[in-house]
Amino acid sequence: MSDLLSRRLALLGAAANLPLLTECLHGIERECLRVDSDGKLALTPHPRALGSTLTHPQITTDYSEALLEFITPTETDVADTLGDLERIHRFASSQLDGEYLWSPSMPCELPDEESIPIARYGNSMIGRLKYVYRKGLALRYGKTMQCIAGIHYNFSLPEKLWPLLRQAEGSELAERDYQSAAYIALIRNFRRYSWLLMYLFGASPALDAGFLRGRPSQLERFDEHTLYLPYATSLRMSDLGYQNNAQAGLTPCYNDLQSYIDSLRKAVSTPYPAYEKIGTKQDGEWVQLNTNVLQIENEYYSSIRPKRVTYTGERPVQALAARGVQYVEVRCLDINPFLPLGIDLDEARFLDAFLLFCAFSDSPLLNGECSDATDNFLAVVKEGRRPGLQLRRRGQPVELKDWASELLERIADTAALLDRARGGEAHAAALAAQRAKVADPELTPSAQVLKVMRERGESFEAFSLRQSREHAEYFRQHPLAADEQARFEQMASASLAEQAELERDQDGDFDTFVAAYQASILGLISN
């Protein structure tokens, strides 16, 4: 164990400080496609019974009208977070008339690009802005890539913990700056070690053959309808997914918060020639918000983000610049198609231990490690289960199995401290489940997907539809209690009323609104 990690764990293990570890906050966002009874993309509008996608706090859409996104409230106990997520699933599933929630991350068989419906958010200024932003995404990356779903895991350490660490370490940084620097250090370590998450939890080794739209790839044919890689863990996170030339040169530096903010500010204010050729309007209709490298900060695709809750009308980068980092959003997690919620308590508890390990361990600047971190991540998502696979650690080759075992050994102390804080041995059990996967790659979700498909003679689509139907049956057999059902129905109707009010109470025209939105970031740059 590193000296810094052991010192910090000892400090937090003191009787007066141990309860702090029960105050970490969690939130989960789960995306999933709506599909029809045959497993094809649902072309129906977002069900009105689910409320307004613009204003509902827990049920919205991501890119497509058919790509649902479920958002839990924050909780200190991740078991409560998963309980929240399950209730959202139960309600949503009960409102889908003959449709299913698609079980894996990679999409079902998709119609042609033109027929994939972009999510709509009504006629308010902000609703129209969200729609135009998505039109821009379609122009830049194509609609097919936008139909990939994932799980986002939001995590924060207790605010009271940072002054404790700062004082113990004699830091001269202001409290807010110390906290931000600590979160950026967590992110650097996440970049170093996130390949481990892809090995343990990657669950997308195969995809529908039509997904590539005829483009050449390294993928092999599993059957007539399915492409795969035999040792892949997460094709979703591989380079066949979300890459584009404009973002290729945009790798925000995680040396400190300011350099991260500066790189995003630059990207949202620097024109990109290919987008300039298109322009923002075609035949008088908006097609993208601007012609810059990024239309908005959230367009930048990354496996983890530093975050701060925004005020109304505030942009993410403004919130970070004004008040520092508040939490991290882990974005690289596949949906486990065997689980009704796509994630379970073992995974969540291990994530807590992993993220605390990243936060408390020594985290030097990445400098020359950046390319190794990227290469390791890509190697694992494409061939993480290959026997003898080697990664690079500090420039030297190391076998994945050896490095993974060492990391789990180091994470064990953090898991043990979490168990001391909460009572029981749940985090140790979650860690043991991951050790078993390192010892036997056949226990990983990616291997299990291929195993079941082979044993049952199923294509990716047939496997996924069967899982989706099984999950629908699970939710049907576990309906919400009447008071919970009523609460969700009330939330849905309140969100529809709120959207209607927004649409009534708006002044000015859309062009002016977009210009003001753009100026908010440009004003930040000039300050």
Curated annotation (Swiss-Prot):
One of its GO terms (molecular function) is metal ion binding. SUPFAM superfamilies: Glutamine synthetase/guanido kinase (SSF55931). Its EC number is 6.3.2.2. It catalyses: L-cysteine + L-glutamate + ATP = gamma-L-glutamyl-L-cysteine + ADP + phosphate + H(+). InterPro entries: Gln_synth/guanido_kin_cat_dom (IPR014746), Glu_cys_ligase (IPR007370), Glut_cys_ligase (IPR006334). It holds the Pfam family Glu_cys_ligase. GO terms for biological process: glutathione biosynthetic process. Pathway: Sulfur metabolism; glutathione biosynthesis; glutathione from L-cysteine and L-glutamate: step 1/2. PANTHER family: GLUTAMATE--CYSTEINE LIGASE (PTHR38761:SF1). Belongs to the glutamate--cysteine ligase type 1 family. Type 1 subfamily. This is Glutamate--cysteine ligase. The gene is gshA.
